[in-house]
C-alpha cells in the first residue's frame, strides 16, 4: 500500500499521474473544498477505483432528517455531473453514509 499526501490545489498533474499509472486507487476527499476535490480528480479514476468524500449526505433534506454526521459540506447535487460523466456508481454506501462519507466506484 502506498499512501500519498499532496496539496491537491498545487499538484493536479502529479496526483493525476499517481491515479492513472498506479494500481488500484482509493481517493479520499477530506480537505477544505471536497466538492472541488471530487470534481477535479474523479475523471482520472480507472475501472474499479474508489473515491470517497467526507461530510457528505445525498441531500440537505436527507441530512436534516437523519443527521448521521454533524457537518454537511457535499451532497449529490454538487457532484452529479462527475458521477454521470465519469461512470461512477455508489459503493458500500449503506455503511459509509452512517459516518458521513460517500463512496463511489468507477465502472
Predicted regions located by residue number:
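S-adenosylmethionine/decaboxylated-SAM
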Residues: 1-107
